[in-house]
């Protein structure tokens, strides 16, 4: 068991429940971690504005990974501006193809916050990701299913590369970071970390690579892992 010096945690489906409500158990556990001097990193497919609000609400100090690794941020670095790692033009070319193919009948609806996204394009999840992946197989773009949305991203970035870059920026030892997630877009993220945790509601692919699969779902699973591996309770 590695010594945990930081915790990186996903948001939707990990510290929130199936209705995207923040679990009090996760809030309490993450604040307990911060009070113990262990920084918490928020890692999500959401935009930086949303992520910053979550980080402020929880009280985390470890930095942020946003837009599935396309953006990273930490107060006091880069003149307090986000660092953009992903190339949104790749997603834009794929989206232009979809618009040309389907016109007004396009079956994929862009989420309202897309104008604020700087590294990817995001659709509401009104269908499985496989048809979209097939449509865009000839494009230099990755299709991620976050459980709540479908994301078109630069294949050169993911939550894992975002974690690596943030760790370099803040001088974290990535081998001592516990990563907690639930969905497909957390696979690379967990692989990058030192100790991998999947909450009970996680997809099978994530459970297969996890060092520990929680008995509890959502935020209760986050609290379970923190109590067990950080505080030995």
Per-range role (PLM):
Residues 1-9, 169-172, 176:
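Non-catalytic pre-domain segments flanking phosphatase-related domains
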Residues 3-20, 190:
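Asp-based phosphoryl-transfer active-site loop
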Residues 18-112:
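Active-site phosphate-binding/coordination module
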Residues 26, 51-55, 132, 206, ...:
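Hydrophobic packing residues within well-ordered alpha-helices of enzyme cores
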Residues 44, 68, 190, 211, ...:
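Residue-level signal for inorganic ion chemistry
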Residues 95-193, 197, 201, 207-209:
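Conserved acidic, metal-coordinating active-site core of Asp-based
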Residues 213-216:
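Short acidic-hydrophobic, aromatic-tinged amphipathic segments that line or gate anion-handling sites
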Residues 228-233:
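Generic C-terminal helix-cap and adjacent flexible tail
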């Amino acid at each position: 068991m590695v010594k945990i010096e930081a915790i990186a945690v996903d948001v939707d489906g990990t510290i929130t429940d199936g209705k995207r409500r923040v679990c009090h158990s996760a809030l309490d556990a993450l604040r307990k971690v911060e009070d113990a001097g262990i920084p918490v990193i928020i890692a999500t497919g959401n935009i930086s504005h949303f992520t910053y609000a979550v980080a402020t609400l929880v009280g985390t100090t470890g930095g942020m990974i946003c837009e599935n690794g396309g953006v990273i941020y930490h107060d006091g670095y880069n003149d307090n501006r986000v660092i953009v790692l992903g190339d949104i033009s790749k997603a834009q070319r794929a989206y232009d193809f979809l618009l040309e193919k389907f016109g007004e009948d396009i079956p994929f609806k862009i989420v309202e916050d897309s104008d604020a996204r700087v590294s990817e394009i995001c659709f509401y999840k009104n269908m499985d990701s496989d048809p979209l992946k097939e449509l865009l197989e000839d494009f230099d773009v990755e299709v991620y299913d976050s459980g709540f949305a479908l994301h078109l991203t630069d294949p050169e970035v993911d939550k894992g590369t975002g974690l690596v870059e943030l760790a370099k920026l803040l001088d974290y030892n990535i081998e001592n970071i516990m990563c907690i997630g639930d969905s497909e877009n957390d696979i690379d993220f967990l692989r990058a970390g030192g100790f991998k945790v999947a909450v009970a509601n996680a997809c099978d692919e994530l459970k297969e690579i996890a060092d520990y699969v929680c008995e509890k779902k959502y935020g209760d699973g986050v609290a379970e892992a923190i109590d067990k591996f950080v505080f030995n309770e």
